[in-house]
Amino acid sequence: MRTLLLCFFIAAATNGQAHEVDNIDYDLYTDGTAWVADGKKAQGDVTIPSKIEVDGKEYTVVGINSNAFSANESITSVTLPDNLKYINDEAFSYCYNLENINNIPKHIENLGENGRIFYRTKFLDNGIKNEFFVFSDWLIKYTPQGETAKVTVPEGIFGISAYALTDADNTVVLPKSLRAASVLAFNSDLKYIDTGDNPVYAYKDGILFCEGTVTFYKNERELKDEVSVDGMWADVIFNNAVKNGVLLIPGKVETAGNVVKQVGGVRKGKLPGLTCEKLIVDEGVKYITDHAFRFFEPLQYVDLPSTLMNIGSWAFVDAKIESLVCRMPQPMNVPYYFVSYIKKFNSKVYVPKALLDTYKTTETYWNLIPAENFYQIEGNVPESGILASVKPIESVGKATVKAIYTLNGTKVNSLQHGINIVKMSDGTVRKVINKGYKNR
């Protein structure tokens, strides 16, 4: 199965050298490719060649960089090269007189992240008069032609650009052909996504998941720490994913053909203004990448699973976390900026009892947190965080359920509706609120 790097900004290699051809500057690379870097001197009908020759060497034009033609009011049409694969953010934004794009490739790998490739152009103004404005194999914008409860994205669409479906707030049906969708593509109040027979997308409880490859830095921001991970990623989180102030990232999700797949992590993305105080990441999830919950200030309680292996430096930047529960079996090597924000807000950190002293004395960045801010998990998780236990209690850490009691001390065989007292095999005791989960 083909997987796709779900990152909506493609940056060319860093060995680029600039060279001008016919009033267009190109960045040249040692792999024989060229990117349009600056076309602000171009005028009228512009043709971007498929290949350019510099000092006897031929380069294939594969991309147009961010803002390359931005605010050029002199161009009226652009003919694209046959080998074009990437167009980055705002490449043609504010080109007010740009009306025609010719020789559009049948397939584009990436159309930027912010959805403003053709912002404030005649080309876009004309395109959005149609119900579905499609550029190459990307949906640029859906425009309602009347009231509809369900929007079906046409088959053959490879990618959905940012803001393409913001006018759809009920149900969206994704095509089998879809392999890429911006985290900003949808209305945050969208009620449901039908992924149908799509083999790489899945939707569960207000979260859109996508199977693919994500490249990120492991713990620190050095190239030697860069890793690429294949898996199923929590990609877009909608408002209805939050239940009673709690956002649960599940450990498993069902895809087409009733295939259950493990959720590998939460991808770099932007939350659509959720009102959420508590985040629970279920067992099985291994990665929380950079910016996954950045600027999410209402977040006060975070519960991390024992399976977690990596947190991005900026994963929780500016989230005013009061209580952080770390169920990992040993102090994870975390990045400096993650710990610095935990320290900044004087957060309480709850860890397994056996690791309490280890966290206080570790040589990792955890030692930046005052020793008095560490607490053992059993019996000390704050009341404000008890709702974290809405996830199946059998999946919390490696301990198993030994006995379940009601509040009045009566022993029962399974979780009852409401508050339960649960004794675990490791000797810990937990309060668990059951809102419908059945004992597995």
What spans do the regions from the language model cover?
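Boundary at the C-terminal end of the N-terminal hydrophobic targeting segment
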Residues: G16-E20
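A structural signal for leucine-rich repeat
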Residues: F316, Y337-I342, E363
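Consensus positions within tandem repeat domains that build extended binding/scaffold surfaces
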Residues: S66-A68, N88-A91, G115-I117, Y163-A164, ...
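Structural signature of tandem-repeat unit edges
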Residues: N23-G32, K41-G63, N72-Y86, C95-G112, ...
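Sec-dependent N-terminal signal peptides
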Residues: T3-A12
